[in-house]
Curated annotation (Swiss-Prot):
It comes from Aeromonas hydrophila subsp. hydrophila (strain ATCC 7966 / DSM 30187 / BCRC 13018 / CCUG 14551 / JCM 1027 / KCTC 2358 / NCIMB 9240 / NCTC 8049). InterPro entries: 3-IsopropMal_deHydase_ssu, Aconitase/3IPM_dehydase_swvl, AconitaseA/IPMdHydase_ssu_swvl, IPMI_Swivel, LeuD. Pfam families: Aconitase_C (PF00694). GO terms for cellular component: 3-isopropylmalate dehydratase complex. One of its GO terms (biological process) is L-leucine biosynthetic process. Catalyzes the isomerization between 2-isopropylmalate and 3-isopropylmalate, via the formation of 2-isopropylmaleate. The lineage of its organism: Bacteria, Pseudomonadati, Pseudomonadota, Gammaproteobacteria, Aeromonadales. Its EC number is 4.2.1.33. GO terms for molecular function: 3-isopropylmalate dehydratase activity. This is 3-isopropylmalate dehydratase small subunit.
Amino acid sequence: MTGFKQHKGIVVPLDSANVDTDAIIPKQFLQKVNRIGFGKHLFHDWRFLDDAGQQPNPEFVLNQPQFAGASILLARENFGCGSSREHAPWALADYGFKTIIAPSFADIFYGNAINNGMVPVRLKEEEVDALFQLVAAQPGIEIEVDLEANQVRADSLCFGFEIDEFRRYCLLNGLDAIGLTLQHEAAISAFEAKQPSWI
């Protein structure tokens, strides 16, 4: 997992509350157990007018040219609600999103996003409103998420955010559960060497 310190990118506004995991990645695309290849199905039922995913919906924000290459998703409250499928953050990451900004996230989605190297940023509702207004006035604007400073910076706006220190440490250093365990590889090997061979 790659460490996250700062990221500056185009922000795309998804002006919907309670976006659930079935909207993020519909159930018919959950047939794989690796993380690659889900991005093309992200928001499938909103991005496309047909089941085969061949006819883009020109009204959907991700299909609008000013947001091409967006890597920051701006959303409303309770993002990622619904089922606990880890495929949801996989799809967002595979599409190219590095961070998601919203007033609140579903708890399981929040943890899954962090475990997959994405930074879910919780801002106050009025701060999210200000970002939506900024993007409406300047479509395609880039904003910066700084995990070292715990700040979101955009134009003249600067908002602080909070994140659990352990999770912040993991994101900054690119550590998932396996990476954390491997930090103690020498101690684990030393412990195992002292155990009877039949254990």
